[in-house]
Amino acid sequence: IAPTILELAGVEPDGMLPISGRSIVNILRSEKNGIVDETRKYVFMGRERHSSSRWENLGYPQRAIRSREHLFIWNIKPERWPAGAPQAINNETGKVYPMYGIDEKGIHHSGWAFTDVDDAPSKSFLIENYKDPVIHPYFCMAYDKRPEFELYNVNDDPFCLHNLAGNANYVSVEKELKTALQNEMERSGDPRMIGPDKEIFETYIRYSPIRIFPKPDWEK
């Protein structure tokens, strides 16, 4: 995004910190359909902390690579909840909220659980009805933990519902994308790959309010 904005604004990045990304202005301005820039084989993505949604203000680190046919995701800390912890603690009273933020009347309170997802009627509906056999699969897709590696054929499975990671028929594809992702992480100096402090992103200060959560089992 940064190099694209700079090019559109006619600003040279002189004196700025190094930018690893490449501008996509040529793609945005193109009138072609399909693949516009044949020199681009992959798109790389990453995530760390989105909000205060886990114990000790931890994030949910992910790295991903997208080719024309496949999406490969590395969930670096699969023991964590991607949508935020399923229980929070009241900052004032120290009381632990009920599991999934559902009170004794069966009503979901959005600020009590899965706080990496904003308040919404759809959020509350899925959580309040998670025991319903029809609703449960959707609840899991939205809020459950994810495996360390995910691989999807985005042409055959555009909604990415069928994880092919570990599938014997996709060993070569998974290896290719995993290697390309790791090579890019090394090239760009990603701390999650090359260190020396692979957890440095966890130490960044958050200046907005911080929620409190129970200590997870994997830290006890």
Predicted regions mapped to residue ranges:
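Sec/Tat-exported extracytoplasmic proteins
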Residues: A9, L28, K32, L181, ...
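C-terminal cap/loop subdomain of S1 sulfatases and analogous C-terminal strand-loop tails that border
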Residues: P13-E150
